[in-house]
Amino acid sequence: SSLTAWNHKNFAPHAKKIVIDIDPAETDKLDMDIAVRVDGDLAAVLPLLAEQEYEMAAELPTWQTYCARMKEKYPAITAEMRAEKDYVDAHVFVDELSRQLTADDVIVPESSGAAGEITYQALRVKRGQKVKNAAGLGSMGFGVPYALGACLANGKRRTILIDGDGAFQLNIQELATIAQHRLPIKMFLWINGGYASIMGT
């Protein structure tokens, strides 16, 4: 619920929702209409889905037109964000970072809060880059160890962590591991008076 917010009924209210979860108790927590519920291991369910025939191709142009309209209506970077102020706007920062990143970079946004959410909104991904999803599912402090693991798992490719100052402190001891293995991890920390997710609950 930390990723979809707490008002489940307003989560994609007009969408047909299909929920696949290995733990039925997790699906039971969702207070929303679920069109198809599958209690099972995704490893077993995905091959079954791959065997099905879908009639999505006819709807694809309509969906692409809708997406283009939404991108125009809700741009990731607005003129107001670009306006000069006494701090760097987070969206503008991610936009500039996107410009400077290379096709070989691995990008790891923090698992919770603005560092993750804004990065996913404003990052322009280049072919060849790897952007790691917030596999911590909102767990604060996930960023530093996740960047460490992502760097090692990708052959020590340059790894970019975008983290909030509060979350960064929770696993700061992993800096010793990063230094010991001389990992090419660059960290951008947002000093944003954070803990917004916690303060909002």
Residue ranges of each PLM-predicted region?
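Glycine-rich, acidic loop regions that bind phosphate or pyrophosphate groups
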Residues: 1-66
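Active-site diphosphate/adenylate-binding microenvironment
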Residues: 68-151
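A short acidic, amphipathic alpha-helical/loop segment
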Residues: 5-8, 96, 174-177
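Generic enzyme active-site microenvironment
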Residues: 19, 108, 162-163
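Structural motif corresponding to alpha-helix initiation and N-cap regions
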Residues: 5, 91, 169-172
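Thiamine diphosphate
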Residues: 11, 27-30, 37-39, 43-49, ...
